[in-house]
Amino acid sequence: MLNQRKPVEQMTEAEAAEELAFLAAELSRHDMLYHGKDDPEISDADYDALKRRNDLIEERFPALIREDSPSQKVGAAPSLTFAPVVHARPMLSLDNSFSDEDARAFVAGIYRFLGRLPDGSIAFTVEPKIDGLSMSLRYENRRLVTAATRGDGTTGENVTANVRTIGMIPQRLPAEAPDVVEIRGEIYMAKSDFAALNAEMAAQGRPLYVNPRNTASGSLRQLDAKVTASRRLRFFAYAWGEMSAMPADTQLGMVETFKAWGFPVNPLMQRFFSADELLEHYHHIERERPELDYDIDGVVYKVDQLDLQARLGFRSRSPRWATAHKFPAERAFTRLKGIDIQVGRTGALTPVARLEPITVGGVVVTNATLHNEDYIRGIGNTGEPIREGRDIRIGDMVIVQRAGDVIPQIVDVVMDERPEGTEPYRFPTSCPICGSHAVRDINEKTGKVDAVRRCTGGFVCRAQAVEHLKHFVSRNAFDIEGLGSKQIEFFFESEDETLRIRTAPDIFTLERRQESSLTKLENIDGFGKVSVRKLYEAINARRSIGLHRFIYALGIRHVGETTAKLLARSYGTYEHFGAAMTEAGGFSGDAWNELNSIDGIGEVVARAIVEFYKEPRNLKVLSDLLEEVTPERAEMPVATDSPVAGKTVVFTGSLEKMTRDEAKAKAESLGAKVAGSVSKKTDIVVAGPGAGSKLDKARELGLQTMDEDEWLALIGG
């Protein structure tokens, strides 16, 4: 399934929403296998690839972030075997960096967020990222009282009895330690101890353990603490939770204090002031990795000064002041057997490489993305050469990588092994499904040619029509039980007019058409009286449907589930929405401006919606559909206790007590929506020195305006 995923840059918002739902469920399952059962099905690299895929989609479609997204939670729910422990401070995970460029961007982002010039004045620590089990050790009056796993980040498992058997973890702290101390770190099994344990298992004729990480985790969760004691587990301290007093004001100072208190800390941890120095140490640790007696999968960069950490704060699941720079994922060589072209619901022609099977990162790969025709030709998104201009041809020996994305990708070609007589791949200029012209649109604003070639057949194209119907009945749209992919394809291909479904309204006329038909659905293989009755009941149950589901089901390009909810909340009723979209047809005037002013609706999305409503075929389908179904009035959001919750805020001019990023993060944490432009939908404009046209427009519209001090007073500082 993963090999078939579309490149993120080619996804529509609807496709992105569908995949984010899949990734939320899939990553939750793997979290439970990894954290809860110590029995992972996939490698760490593949897990990181899934998470990175999720992050990339959310980065491109921020309005689609789900409440159950892996980016909004940490780890997995604790098991029922051990008593639950609620962490005094959440145990958050880290954002990942996958390249030197990502690491440099992290450093640059710190300076930018703090409003400082990148002058090398900010110190960062670098330390190996231990591949073990995260642990929180709580000391009260300098005695170890609780040891808990990370769990889901909020609630972990009480494994105190087992942790007491680990000799290098102090049971008591020295007199200078504060009354309440939570030390956080990683429990792991040394490679040498793991090898010795497996040697013992082999001598006894018992199954061998898979890897040190799983063995350490399983050893810690033994019901018999004597088993844990026999496994020679170890610990590195590197962070903290609740502290009744802070013994240092830097990250490095805290870790040095832990060492003085008797905790083992990693000797490779160092402090630097530039991205170049961070990366030099990263590559040094990477070279030393094979010689280390413990598994690591990257390094961690942290801002050293604790007061700067406090200013930088947190995202929903991770600190803004730290990142994990992962080591590169595995690459492999294989032969490109062919290139298939897939046609999606929006007509996008996507090339997929068919490969001789090869194992990459522990997974057998037979397909890989080729992104688009320019990528095949050796041209990047902005027109620059990639792979030094080397094109990809059928028959080539190619390099396949799984890193930073779920889809395996071809990253290069081995020119020395290119067979004689190969020819450059000719990307089709007609749809392989319906034969219609396939074109690359020109962006009216930039004048650039779209990287994606699209079929112009619209509903004439079977692939687009079928995929559109599948989208219409999908879970987040009309959610009609009994109309899955196979059933949609059957009804679409039927030659019987009483069975045929070619557009959405046909779904709701099926039962009426069948009443006078000689070809009864219940007599067709795969159906029966009971299943047909249930199908009709499911269809009729959807004759009244939420407005956001109705809008989402239309399959408008760039309009995913979250965008549909924004539109529904903004317009309230379909009558208002439909009339406004028709009125906005000239891409100007009040209706057009109102659409563009909705926070989360940019011009690209707005133009796609209006274009949809200008197409006569779409209007005919809509008219027929509205004869059969009734979109319900949208529910309006409930306000919270925050004085700015649900309000749209615009910051303009210079801010003197915080950076723009800090102000935005604070406003969003209080439930406000931050917009970049002023409109009738704006509630508050915060204006600092140098405020210009935005402040003028706010006054012209009679909006509430305030300066930075008034804003801070409103939100409580």
From Swiss-Prot:
Keyword Ligase: yes
A GO cellular component entry from the record: cytosol
Enzyme class: ligase
Any Pfam family hit: HHH_2
Residues that hold Zn(2+) according to the record: C431, C434, C455, C461
UniProt EC number: 6.5.1.2
Superkingdom, taxonomy of origin: Bacteria
Function: DNA ligase that catalyzes the formation of phosphodiester linkages between 5'-phosphoryl and 3'-hydroxyl groups in double-stranded DNA using NAD as a coenzyme and as the energy source for the reaction. It is essential for DNA replication and repair of damaged DNA.
NCBIfam families listed in its UniProt record: dnlj, PRK07956.1
Protein name: DNA ligase
Protein's organism: Sinorhizobium medicae (strain WSM419)
Gene name, Swiss-Prot/TrEMBL: ligA
